[in-house]
């Protein structure tokens, strides 16, 4: 838009003024005031358009966009699933319209999180009376829906079959290598989880979510292992494999194992999505030893885990039945 002595346009919900170089400094304040008075009706109109719009987008820079213009951004709240929202609006907007827009965007973001991350949100709303089940839910929440099984082995040992059924109904997978939420590995869920996580912890590292559709990554030795685990990839040397694919591979190995030995087949390799050479290397990193039958020269694998020597083992204290996870009760998605 063009007004007397300046040019300007509205981007999203903010005015971008371009004052002429000939304007006196003493005039700038009055010019801005005049511009904002002229543009107030347009801002009110846009609030109505945004509320009726289906063009909102929550981008990976932690901002909410409307028609390619940022209108709000998130900042850390009480936890990563409950961020605070700050709207990006010009001061020309009246208080009623501002509050109307803010309340709408808060609800929009809340509904987005609740819908896309239902299983994760459900963890912190757990009402289980079993401390071990609640403890596992808390650990999953703390680690964005994915944890290594070895880190909670004592908790797992104390979860009954009935409690495991409850966890399974809640979307929790207790696997051979990881405890995770399978639905949280879907593209929309991964993007949203990472977006909220990085905003809460204010992670500024250059990290990119692996391309969706890939089950296997290689030559990633310098990558952030913790970040990739949150994205759903476990590390083995220079390789990364999706945690759900890793579990499926383990099941295929179990199905093919006889007398503690198994042969690889094309289904296993195709599942992982790598070359045969890399598959052999991956199995070795997973502590499977390749051997050859002296009689028929057939190749097979056996599981031979390496035992840690002279290393202090981390002991996980058992949970007191009368000491519930008080912190978990503080984490409620509102």
Language model: regions and residue ranges:
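Short linear clamp-binding motif
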Residues: 315-334
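Extended, charged helical/alpha-beta scaffold domains that provide interaction surfaces
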Residues: 1-310
């Amino acid at each position: 838009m063009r007004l007397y002595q300046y040019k300007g346009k509205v981007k999203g919900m903010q005015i971008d003024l371009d004052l002429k170089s000939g304007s006196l400094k003493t005039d700038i304040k009055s010019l801005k005031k005049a511009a904002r008075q002229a543009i107030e009706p347009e801002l009110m109109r846009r609030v109505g358009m945004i509320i009726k719009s289906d063009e909102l987008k929550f981008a990976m820079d932690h901002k909410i966009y409307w028609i390619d213009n940022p209108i709000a951004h998130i900042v850390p709240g009480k936890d990563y699933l409950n961020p605070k929202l700050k709207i990006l609006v010009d001061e020309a907007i009246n208080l009623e319209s501002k509050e109307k827009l803010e309340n709408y965007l808060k609800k929009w973001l809340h509904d987005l999180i609740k819908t896309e991350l239902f299983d994760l949100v459900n963890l912190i709303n757990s009402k289980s009376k079993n401390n071990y089940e609640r403890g596992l839910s808390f650990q999953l929440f703390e680690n964005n829906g994915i944890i290594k099984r070895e880190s909670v082995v004592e908790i797992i040992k104390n979860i009954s079959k009935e409690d495991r059924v409850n966890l399974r109904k809640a979307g929790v997978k207790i696997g051979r290598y990881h405890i995770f939420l399978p639905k949280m590995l879907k593209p929309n869920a991964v993007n949203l989880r990472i977006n909220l996580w990085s905003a809460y912890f204010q992670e500024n590292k250059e990290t990119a979510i692996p391309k969706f559709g890939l089950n296997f990554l290689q030559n990633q030795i310098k990558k952030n292992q913790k970040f990739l685990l949150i994205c759903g990839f476990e590390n083995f040397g220079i390789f990364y494999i999706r945690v759900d694919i890793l579990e499926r591979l383990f099941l295929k190995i179990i199905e093919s194992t006889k007398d503690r030995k198994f042969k690889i087949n094309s289904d296993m390799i195709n599942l992982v999505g790598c070359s045969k050479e890399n598959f052999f290397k991956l199995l070795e990193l997973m502590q499977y030893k390749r051997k050859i039958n002296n009689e028929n020269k057939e190749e097979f694998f056996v599981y031979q885990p390496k035992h840690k020597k002279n290393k202090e083992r981390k002991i996980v204290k058992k949970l007191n039945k009368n000491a519930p996870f008080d912190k978990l009760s503080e984490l409620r998605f509102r």
